[in-house]
């Protein structure tokens, strides 16, 4: 079979860009904003990267071990690709990192300090010669938690390589090796903004103060241009907004700009991730000292994949947290104003245990940023309902189905559903055949119900499942009803203690 070449090209174009999943944004999320919103880059995170982010940090390709795993054999391929992508699309580029206690070449530990210093200088100089326009550089990464000084990092089984001695070791300040690293960085990268980067700082005031001690040493020599806090999910989750902001304030008191450098928001369930994004991200973005935020991956396959930190699904669909993020950054959030619940087939009755009824929620306005809802049913011993709104009858009775908006407004919609079980009928004649309703149509809401000797409960519902009136503990054969309602079609539910039945009535 032959296929038109143009059609084939269009097919593969759509496939390669992910447009089968969802239309791509025209510009990066933070385009035109006073602070950047970026992401870690790797081959696995490359697809449509420039459509979302205006800042790029190579996740692993710019680390010393990735570039010079074998001594004197430089592999620049990954960093070249990252740098080229950033420059092509006008994205801010940040080198990550120069000095760290992890992911440095394994061979560095076997050298004497003189040779180590020579190799460090060579690493700096070759970077500077090859990449002349790096806006930001993480000079030292994780000095408190993962230093190249022979320490045993938290959770590790082996001590780090000690090449800090080649940079002066602890020295008089306790942090001479950090200061030397920044002096070297200022020498080789005079036009780049130099950053000190660390994790799990802002969840602890004690750690924040220790971090500031190093920062002030660097400030004294005019060596540091910004403060990096990774702000991974394991730092922010469980830490109050008050404490996060208070520690950001302490860092800001140094007078330096702050960069949240490796942010991720966990959540295998969309509503969980959205809730945490709405809680954490505004603390960062709205802080006057924060000048940029970098997510540590956004696609499936990122480093916290099992925790669900990705913002775009495998199918290329943006998760609600990402949709909210874009709207928040651009101040275009539209909150829900109403939620209406109905069944997809218009029914308000499930007449057999184990049967299902598909529910739907209409969220208005139609352009609500987050139109998703959470489904619940009460009492829960009578029915269950799943995340897609499929109600399953468990026991006879009346349940209230509720749809609650995810957008934080608390908007809810409800509908009552009657559950009966035709197999429990005790009369040879169907319950509905024993009951008469007249006149039908009813004028001005006046009508009479006969044949209700066995009936214990009568309820009147409108077409969207809203209960209008109810009569309980009945012990009579006739009931005269008068209701003040709008003209329309209504449903009368009858319950005899074992089964439900219903009749429609027109009220004029």
Regions picked out by a protein language model, each given a short descriptive name:
Residues 68, 126, 142-171, 184, ...:
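Aromatic-rich peripheral "rim/lid" segments of glycoside hydrolase catalytic domains that contact
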Residues 1-23:
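Bacterial Sec-dependent N-terminal signal peptides
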Residues 37-48, 64-77, 104, 144-147, ...:
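Acidic-and-aromatic substrate-binding clefts and catalytic sites of carbohydrate-active enzymes
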Residues 367, 372-374, 381, 387, ...:
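C-terminal outer-membrane/trafficking sorting elements
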Residues 77-89, 171-197, 204-271, 281-285, ...:
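Glycoside hydrolase catalytic-domain groove-lining segments
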Residues 22-59:
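Boundary/entry segment of secreted carbohydrate-active catalytic domains
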Residues 333-426:
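Extracytoplasmic soluble-region selector
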Residues 51-69, 77-201, 250, 267:
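Substrate-binding cleft and catalytic face of glycoside hydrolase catalytic domains
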């Amino acid at each position: 079979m032959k296929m038109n070449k143009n059609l084939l090209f269009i097919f593969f174009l759509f496939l390669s860009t992910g447009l089968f999943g969802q239309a791509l944004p025209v510009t990066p999320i933070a385009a035109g904003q006073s602070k950047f919103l970026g992401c870690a880059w790797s081959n696995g995170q490359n697809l449509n990267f420039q459509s979302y982010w205006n800042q790029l940090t190579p996740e692993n390709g710019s680390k010393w071990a990735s570039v010079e795993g074998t001594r004197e054999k430089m592999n620049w391929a990954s960093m070249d690709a990252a740098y080229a992508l950033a420059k092509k699309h006008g994205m801010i580029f940040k080198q990550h990192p120069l000095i760290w206690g992890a992911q440095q070449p394994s061979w560095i530990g076997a050298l004497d300090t003189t040779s180590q210093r020579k190799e460090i200088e060579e690493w700096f100089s070759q970077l500077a010669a090859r990449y002349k326009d790096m806006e930001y550089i993480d000079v030292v990464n994780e000095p408190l938690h993962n230093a190249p000084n022979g320490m045993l990092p938290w959770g590790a089984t082996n001590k780090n390589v000690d090449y800090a001695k080649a940079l002066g070791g602890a020295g008089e300040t306790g942090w001479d090796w950090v200061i030397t690293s920044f002096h070297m960085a200022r020498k080789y990268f005079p036009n780049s903004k130099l950053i000190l980067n660390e994790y799990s700082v802002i969840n602890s005031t004690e750690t924040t103060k220790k971090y500031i001690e190093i920062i002030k040493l660097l400030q004294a020599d005019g060596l540091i241009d910004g403060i990096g806090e990774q702000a991974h999910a394991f730092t922010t989750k469980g830490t109050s907004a008050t404490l996060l902001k208070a520690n950001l304030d302490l860092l800001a008191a140094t007078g330096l700009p702050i960069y949240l450098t490796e942010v991720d928001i966990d959540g295998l369930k969309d509503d969980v991730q959205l809730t945490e994004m709405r809680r954490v991200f505004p603390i960062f973005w709205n802080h006057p000292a924060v000048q940029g935020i970098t997510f540590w991956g956004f696609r499936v396959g990122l480093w916290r994949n099992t925790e669900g930190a990705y913002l775009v699904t495998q199918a290329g669909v943006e998760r609600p947290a990402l949709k909210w993020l874009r709207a928040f950054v651009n101040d275009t959030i539209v909150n829900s104003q109403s939620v209406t619940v109905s069944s997809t087939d218009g029914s308000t009755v499930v007449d057999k245990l184990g049967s299902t009824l598909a529910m739907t929620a209409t969220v208005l306005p139609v352009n609500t940023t987050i139109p998703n809802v959470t489904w619940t049913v009460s009492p829960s011993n009578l029915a269950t309902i799943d995340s897609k709104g499929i109600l399953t009858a468990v026991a006879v009775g009346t349940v209230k189905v509720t749809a609650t908006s995810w957008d934080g407004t608390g908007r809810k919609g409800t509908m009552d559903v009657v559950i009966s079980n035709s197999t429990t009928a005790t009369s040879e004649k169907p319950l509905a055949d024993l009951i008469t309703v007249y006149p039908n149509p009813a004028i001005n809401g006046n009508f009479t119900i006969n044949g209700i000797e066995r009936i214990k409960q009568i309820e009147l519902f409108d077409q969207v499942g809203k209960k209008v009136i109810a009569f309980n503990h009945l012990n009579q054969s006739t009931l005269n009803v008068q209701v003040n309602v709008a003209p329309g079609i209504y449903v009368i539910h009858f319950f005899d203690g074992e089964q439900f039945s219903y009749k429609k009535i027109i009220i004029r």
